[in-house]
């Protein structure tokens, strides 16, 4: 644990995409048959500094970073105590939960968290399950189409400012959209994960 509340711990044996990670709070290190397990005990707001910087680029607008901070905070509160009790932890630092400390916190990620401190997304007074994705395929969808079960605050929405829907009434038009040949300006259309393929059997259809 650092000597001061704003101190950090560097773990030189770890390597993340953004370099050697540094951690606020304290580290609990235990050894088991497979190696060492490291659990970072940190307050949620400082944890979010490293989530926002790792989940979205700090070059994004401040309002986008604030939106990410609010979603990530809601996701965190919803997951506390759910899945990792066997490790004396609440979350892991990968896409299984939220990516944490893969890139160092930045002035922008700190500002986004600080300026939304304590704000969470709610529906009917309850914190929502604020799931989000790293790469948009041009539209969102409802929860029942992904996991089953209804979350009424999720909806299908085209991810562009005009909220217009491309012409999908025939196979050629749909294929042109999937191949990026249309003029529809949707978020992240030029990224590799913008389109993907899934297969269903006749019975599943």
Language-model-derived ranges and their functions:
Residues 1-205:
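Conserved, single-site charged/polar hotspot
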């Amino acid at each position: 644990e650092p000597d001061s509340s704003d101190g950090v711990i560097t773990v030189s044996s770890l390597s993340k995409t953004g370099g050697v990670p540094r951690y606020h709070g304290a580290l609990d290190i235990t050894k088991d048959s497979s190696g060492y397990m490291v659990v970072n005990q940190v307050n949620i707001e400082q944890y979010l500094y490293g989530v926002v910087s790792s989940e979205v680029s700090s070059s994004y607008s401040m309002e986008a970073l604030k939106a990410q901070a609010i979603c990530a905070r809601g996701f965190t509160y919803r997951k506390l105590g759910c899945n990792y009790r066997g490790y004396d932890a609440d979350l892991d630092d990968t896409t299984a939960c939220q990516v944490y400390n893969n890139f160092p916190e930045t002035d922008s990620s700190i500002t986004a968290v600080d300026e939304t401190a304590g704000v969470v997304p709610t529906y009917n007074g309850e914190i929502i399950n604020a799931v989000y994705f790293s790469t948009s395929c041009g539209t969102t969808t409802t929860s029942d189409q992904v996991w089953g079960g209804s979350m009424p605050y999720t909806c299908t929405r085209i991810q562009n400012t005009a909220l217009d829907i491309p012409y999908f009434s025939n196979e050629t038009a749909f294929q042109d959209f999937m191949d990026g040949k249309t003029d529809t300006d949707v978020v992240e259309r030029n990224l590799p994960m913008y389109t993907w393929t899934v297969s269903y059997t006749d019975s599943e259809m």
